């Protein structure tokens, strides 16, 4: 089947093209007409650099992995979904027989096929065929745009869960880009206050719209240190989420953490990053790392439906599919949230 798709040909070059899909509807699959696709930081990384760490774009690849749409066909074994249902899709398809999947950590399955992670094509196209087990019905009060945001929110949920947040904890989020959505998950997880820092005031203005968030421009490191001291009585934050992937930040990640605190590494540096091990040892910092999520979509959808996760301020613009190239060019500007 030939359809229109947004294809990354190589670093810096994308175009809408006729694309051949070889997907076949299986008994346990659904076919989905794509309605809304978000632009993630990883999409922009691939667009700009053609790689993230070991994941290298060696041949043309369809972009996009944050999506929602409408079911247009369902396999004979699918009982919980039907044609016409509004849905969002978890973009990773693991081997359900792998040791990791059987242990409930299917996000770590080495054989997982994840949309828009080389060499797997993404979902910025007219339709997809996807396992029904990784397709989730949207409540009536959750829009298509919110449905597309479930994917990055799920990363926040995974991060907040692994951080082991306790009621009343103080959190610090470094990096106010799309993945900085984690701040909402930290608040929902029990943090009484969350400091969020970035070097772009435009991003911080978005963060300021959320109650309980304290936005600080980290160009002024003294201002950041003062805010941490003010909220923690000089102890340091209980949990820190590193969402920037910036090597200088990772090197000094222990500076603002309380003794015995936790650092969650969420952002992905393009290249290996140094870390001050001794500084971390001196505080016995616990490090947690995040690779996507597992079993977080149902929880995230419930929180969206309840109104406890508000993504409206994070939706900066909406583009028609025919304007996808322009949308990516805009998203590649350093101050944009999409």
From Swiss-Prot:
- What PROSITE patterns is this protein classified in? ADH_ZINC
Where are the membrane-spanning stretches?
none
Question: What SUPFAM superfamilies does its record include?
Answer: GroES-like (SSF50129), NAD(P)-binding Rossmann-fold domains (SSF51735)
Cofactor binding: number and manner: Binds 1 zinc ion per subunit.
Tell me yes or no: is Metal-binding among this UniProt entry's keywords. Answer: yes
Keywords, alphabetical: Metal-binding, NAD, Oxidoreductase, Zinc
The protein's superkingdom reads: Bacteria
What does the record give as the reaction this protein catalyses?
Answer: xylitol + NAD(+) = D-xylulose + NADH + H(+)
Which top-level enzyme class is recorded in the Swiss-Prot or TrEMBL entry?
A: oxidoreductase
Q: Which cofactor does it need?
A: Zn(2+)
Binding positions for Zn(2+)? Answer: 40, 65, 151
Gene3D superfamilies linked: Medium-chain alcohol dehydrogenases, catalytic domain, NAD(P)-binding Rossmann-like Domain
On assembly, the entry states: Homotetramer.
Q: Which family does it belong to?
A: Belongs to the zinc-containing alcohol dehydrogenase family.
> What name does the UniProt record give this protein?
D-xylulose reductase
Upper lineage:
Bacteria, Pseudomonadati, Pseudomonadota, Gammaproteobacteria, Enterobacterales
């Amino acid at each position: 089947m030939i359809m229109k798709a947004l294809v990354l040909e190589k670093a810096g070059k994308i175009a809408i093209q006729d694309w051949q899909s070889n997907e076949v509807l299986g008994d346990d699959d659904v076919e989905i007409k794509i309605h809304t696709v978000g632009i993630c930081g990883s999409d922009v990384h691939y667009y700009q650099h053609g790689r993230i760490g070991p994941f290298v774009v060696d041949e043309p690849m369809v972009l996009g992995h944050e999506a929602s749409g409408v079911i247009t066909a369902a396999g004979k074994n699918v009982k919980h979904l039907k044609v016409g249902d509004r849905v969002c899709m978890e973009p990773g398809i693991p081997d359900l027989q792998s040791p990791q999947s059987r242990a409930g950590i299917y996000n770590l399955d080495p054989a997982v096929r994840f949309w828009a992670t080389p060499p797997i094509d993404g979902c910025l196209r007219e339709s997809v065929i996807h396992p029904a087990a990784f397709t989730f019905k949207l409540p009536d009060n959750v829009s298509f745009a919110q449905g597309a945001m479930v994917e990055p929110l799920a990363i926040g949920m995974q991060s907040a869960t692994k951080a082991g947040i306790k009621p009343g904890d103080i959190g610090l989020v470094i990096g106010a880009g799309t993945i900085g959505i984690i701040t909402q998950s930290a608040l929902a997880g029990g943090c009484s206050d969350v400091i969020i820092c970035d070097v772009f005031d435009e991003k911080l203005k978005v963060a300021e719209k959320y109650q309980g968030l304290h936005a600080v421009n980290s160009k002024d490191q003294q201002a950041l240190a003062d805010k941490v001291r003010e909220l923690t009585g000089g102890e340091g934050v209980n949990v820190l989420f590193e969402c920037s992937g910036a090597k200088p930040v990772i090197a000094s990640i222990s500076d603002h953490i309380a003794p015995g605190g936790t650092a969650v590494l969420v952002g992905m540096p393009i290249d290996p990053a140094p870390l001050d091990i001794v500084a971390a040892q001196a505080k016995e910092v616990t490090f947690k790392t995040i690779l996507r999520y597992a079993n977080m979509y149902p929880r995230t959808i419930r929180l969206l439906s309840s109104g406890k996760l508000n993504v409206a301020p994070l939706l900066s613009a909406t583009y028609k599919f025919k304007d996808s190239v322009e949308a990516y060019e805009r998203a590649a500007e350093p101050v944009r949230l999409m």
